[in-house]
UniProtKB/Swiss-Prot annotation:
GO terms for cellular component: actin cytoskeleton; aggresome; cytosol; endoplasmic reticulum; endoplasmic reticulum membrane; neuron projection; neuronal cell body. CDD domains: BACK_KLHL14, BTB_POZ_KLHL14_printor. Residues 69-117 are annotated as: Disordered. SUPFAM superfamilies: Kelch motif, POZ domain. It comes from Mus musculus. This is Kelch-like protein 14.
Amino acid sequence: MSRSGDRTSTFDPSHSDNLLHGLNLLWRKQLFCDVTLTAQGQQFHCHKAVLASCSQYFRSLFSSHPPLGGGVGGQDGLGAPKDQQQQQQPQQQPPQQQQPPPQEEPGTPSSSPDDKLLTSPRAINNLVLQGCSSIGLRLVLEYLYTANVTLSLDTVEEVLSVSKILHIPQVTKLCVQFLNDQISVQNYKQVCKIAALHGLEETKKLANKYLVEDVLLLNFEEMRALLDSLPPPVESELALFQMSVLWLEHDRETRMQYAPDLMKRLRFALIPAPELVERVQSVDFMRTDPVCQKLLLDAMNYHLMPFRQHCRQSLASRIRSNKKMLLLVGGLPPGPDRLPSNLVQYYDDEKKTWKILTIMPYNSAHHCVVEVENFLFVLGGEDQWNPNGKHSTNFVSRYDPRFNSWIQLPPMQERRASFYACRLDKHLYVIGGRNETGYLSSVECYNLDTNEWRYVSSLPQPLAAHAGAVHNGKIYISGGVHNGEYVPWLYCYDPVMDVWARKQDMNTKRAIHTLAVMNDRLYAIGGNHLKGFSHLDVMLVECYDPKGDQWNILQTPILEGRSGPGCAVLDDSIYLVGGYSWSMGAYKSSTICYCPEKGTWTELEGDVAEPLAGPACATVILPACVPYNK
């Protein structure tokens, strides 16, 4: 109690508890809720005032300023509000001209005058939270309304992820405290993995103490097996090296004889060059033992030639994993601005969700990606949407998942978007496409050894929005648009003879589709064609037999129309991500996959960060601990 003249101020210590208790009762009874959050298809009705009072993300979103971290659908992995998605979805409009313009991207919907972004974030009443698990969101919301959060080793990672995405540092702190208190001999490996994934340095150090204590007691055979294990017991090759040094130093007189054998099992090229100098070369036996000297020298030489690393891959430079992951690169979101995405996302099949891996050096859509020795090449595309190809590019970049780094490579000789690119032996090929001059027939070949581009035999006809695949040492190109006309053509390129040959046409004209190879068959999936002046989704799936030069229509059509999806083959299925459905008049954020052996379609859980058309997909091996993009 305090006095000021005739006035008295009395503090009620129970008021805050009573207020929180009252808000919790309103939440439990679903009274006066004014916003709905959706995660993994599960809805949570909440109060904006509660969310904004605890979360910097929601405080920004519900104010007149865009949210931190790039806004809705930005770098923090949040999807666009449902209200915004619905307003952004273009409605199919009857064409105003008698024929498609020659340079227009065929099958790509134009923005309707009615397409508008939300002008007031306060109007947002429905939010789809991409990258948030329903379990994690439920537990975080319980904390907001009760000040208590229920944690276990099975749920703490999901709660931690949601707290970081939504910028709720109090929950993050509780998760870290829980992990630090729970570390034991039985669970330190699991805790160490979670700590590495989320950059929790203090927790990682505490967990590593248990690991080191265990490792020091191993005999030589057990230590050798540990260094060969997949996945590795620690998150980095440097940590594995330091662990090996500790084991050797623990009984130097007896164990130092094993140093060359153990060092051969380390992958020194996975350690960045500065750390090789500062932390590896400084260890005495790495300088004095001939075997160890050579291992260090080989790694340093590898780092000296970054532009040729994809040609010098060996066990010493490969990621310690054998599990390929599905990647989605770039793409064009809905909306009148039509600025392509610069996100690279990967699908976490354990968590059943898409997560942001990294950011490209530029925005891009209608580009191509090619995997080469687990490096990801990103070629061409357009950094702004323009129906005449005005913003087509000739950029070539290479992404290294080991160090989460990009380098720029020599550009293509021509700007091109809506083309096809592939790898064949020691070369990359880029075929057709479009730019400001129109449709292209040119074909360029990039030598992976010499880092140079050259022209090879052109396509018989200019083509854009076609699909391609590599089979048995030859390149197949199907469909596309030729001077405004959709075509069913199939061409085959022989790189040895440098000649193109016409093959049996598809049964259906189509463009902006996909062509994938599985079990010696080519599968043409998705796309659209014109009927009069209307775009129609192609629902039929066709299968081509290269030996018999014959197409067959499969009994199982695609689940829904998809023009311009990303496409990749992983294990026994063909994956299509995003794209545009003409029948639904909507950009897609979901992922569907087709299993040729079973003849079935399924839809994956979890959507990408925002609906996209014109992205590109690939499969690569990622490190065992993939940190979230910061």
